């Protein structure tokens, strides 16, 4: 008698994806973040669903409804902070997942990589709209500043911004539509994540050496299910420490003041995970130039497969490229720090230099170093 999990039309899909999937025998803990992102997404959808049951998307009651969730709803405070800090964990996993892809050359799987970049954009859009919902000072002003950037688009800019706002300023219509989009986008992200996996399973996973591992595969279950479970436990532990001990560590105190369109906060800044892109935006004095740099700072990821000039796939055996990779990581951390600082000397100049270095490393230095390494290895 054949096994049900191998013959049942629905169960066999799950079986081929998570149980009998042939996986390389040498993938390290850096390959854990895919499953962790799946966990984060599920957690965000569930906590978000319970928050949506008590939230009202109206400018007059949005702030009060969040207060009501935290004070009157059973474990409302836990759900709210798990959702807010869950977003931070989501982005930490995302950045590490992308970083692993860059380091080990996973971007050579074109379709998987490009869908991943689209997923990154969608998660950023969802997080931005979610930040607007509590309707605190930073919510309203962050929404105003970021949406107004679209007015830099020639000819249609102003019309586009007013169309997104649903009026002449960020108001009730904006909040309602942001809530609607914030609710629907995670489900679109979940569907795209399945397509991401579909394309990945066409080729099979990459591995740290970057070599073809067809001759040495092991079943996903039990080896990597156990390994992923350890990652899941660590993620939940870190998240719970954050939620239960310092839930506001990564938030902005200004968001505990109800939104007031008549008083501007001294420093308008987005959540920490957008600060690197925000610093790149601010480092260019021209509005349109800044917006283009902001978009290109993420879109540049799609160029990685085209800029890969090395004869080796992974950076594992390429020390010069490794050095540049870690300089790039340090540069991104610097940009994140700059994004949270006021626009004044010396922060502006540091931001400009860090932005130039970011684009230079990706577009020029890494490809040139790859060619040098090819020469050194007589390839």
Curated annotation (Swiss-Prot):
Please tell me where heme b b566 binds in this chain: 97, 196
Q: Which GO terms describe its molecular function?
A: metal ion binding; ubiquinol-cytochrome-c reductase activity
Any Gene Ontology CC annotation: mitochondrial inner membrane
For this UniProt record, the keywords arranged alphabetically read as follows: Electron transport, Heme, Iron, Membrane, Metal-binding, Mitochondrion, Mitochondrion inner membrane, Respiratory chain, Transmembrane, Transmembrane helix, Transport, Ubiquinone
A single GO BP: mitochondrial electron transport, ubiquinol to cytochrome c
Bilayer-crossing residues are 33-53, 77-98, 113-133, 178-198, 226-246, 288-308, 320-340, 347-367
Superkingdom field: Eukaryota
The note describing how and how many cofactors are bound reads: Binds 2 heme b groups non-covalently.
Q: Where does a ubiquinone bind?
A: 201
Does Cytoplasm show up as a keyword for this record? no
Which locations, inside or outside the cell, does it occupy? Answer: Mitochondrion inner membrane
Q: Which residues bind heme b b562?
A: 83, 182
Q: How does it sit in the membrane?
A: Multi-pass membrane protein
Cofactor(s) needed by this chain: heme b
Question: What Gene3D superfamilies has UniProt attached to this entry?
Answer: Cytochrome Bc1 Complex, Chain C
Quaternary context? The cytochrome bc1 complex contains 11 subunits: 3 respiratory subunits (MT-CYB, CYC1 and UQCRFS1), 2 core proteins (UQCRC1 and UQCRC2) and 6 low-molecular weight proteins (UQCRH/QCR6, UQCRB/QCR7, UQCRQ/QCR8, UQCR10/QCR9, UQCR11/QCR10 and a cleavage product of UQCRFS1). This cytochrome bc1 complex then forms a dimer.
Q: Which family does it belong to?
A: Belongs to the cytochrome b family.
Any further remark recorded for this protein? Heme 1 (or BL or b562) is low-potential and absorbs at about 562 nm, and heme 2 (or BH or b566) is high-potential and absorbs at about 566 nm.
Describe the task this protein carries out: Component of the ubiquinol-cytochrome c reductase complex (complex III or cytochrome b-c1 complex) that is part of the mitochondrial respiratory chain. The b-c1 complex mediates electron transfer from ubiquinol to cytochrome c. Contributes to the generation of a proton gradient across the mitochondrial membrane that is then used for ATP synthesis.
What protein name is recorded for this chain? Answer: Cytochrome b
Q: Which organism is it from?
A: Marmota bobak
